[in-house]
UniProtKB/Swiss-Prot annotation:
Keywords: ATP synthesis, Cell inner membrane, Cell membrane, CF(1), Hydrogen ion transport, Ion transport, Membrane, Transport. Disulfide bonds: none annotated. It comes from Aliivibrio fischeri (strain MJ11) (Vibrio fischeri). The keyword Membrane applies. It is found in: Cell inner membrane. InterPro entries: ATP_synth_OSCP/delta_N_sf, ATPase_OSCP/d_CS, ATPase_OSCP/dsu. Belongs to the ATPase delta chain family. One of its GO terms (cellular component) is proton-transporting ATP synthase complex. This is ATP synthase subunit delta. The keyword Cell membrane applies. It comes from the Bacteria. The lineage of its organism: Bacteria, Pseudomonadati, Pseudomonadota, Gammaproteobacteria, Vibrionales.
Length: 177
């Protein structure tokens, strides 16, 4: 996975810088999302693995994408096809979104709780995280009944384990030391 990220990063950075310069971040995010889905299609993936000439491959890919790509998006597809990198489009999208979130000061926070959180609890957690991290927070909530009670929050490098399972584990470690 890290190899794909390394390959995808320069393409994502170039697309991102261009999108910022033109004020078209959301349009580029949509184009890359569409291209990523096209590249993940099993028939297209087989085509990308085949022995098709890069120029022909770019034209086929662009024709599949149709009007979803503007002129500059088509240029990106041509460059990636010339370098045999169309398969890393999902990675380009991933890296682009990371850059976009950094630019817009948005961070994804994974919140795992023992029970389903109410809308009010989600709003409270989001507000407290935004104050602490000084960023907009996008919550991704999930339920894990093995936590027994409480929540685990992961946002970037920050991990807050306020679950009963985590507390019991820390208590056990303390008693054993």
């Amino acid at each position: 996975m890290s190899e794909m990220a390394t390959i995808a990063r320069p393409y994502a950075k170039a697309a991102f810088d261009f999108a910022v310069e033109k004020g078209e971040l959301s349009q580029w995010a949509q184009m890359l999302t569409f291209c990523s889905e096209v590249a993940k299609n099993k028939d297209v993936a087989q085509l990308l693995d085949g022995a098709v000439a890069s120029e022909q491959l770019a034209e086929i890919f662009i024709s599949i994408c149709g009007e979803q790509l503007n002129e500059f998006g088509q240029n990106l597809i041509h460059v990636m096809a010339e370098n045999g990198r169309l398969k890393v489009l999902p990675g380009v999208l991933e890296q682009f979104i990371l850059l976009q979130h950094e630019f817009e000061k948005v961070i994804d926070a994974d919140v795992t709780s023992a029970i389903e959180l109410t809308e009010q609890q989600k709003a409270d957690i989001g507000a407290k995280l935004e104050a602490r991290l000084e960023r907009k927070v996008k919550l991704n909530c999930s339920v894990d009944e093995t936590l027994l009670a409480g929540v685990i929050i992961r946002a970037g490098d920050l991990v807050i384990d306020n679950s009963a399972r985590g507390r019991l584990g820390r208590l056990s470690e303390t008693l054993q030391s």
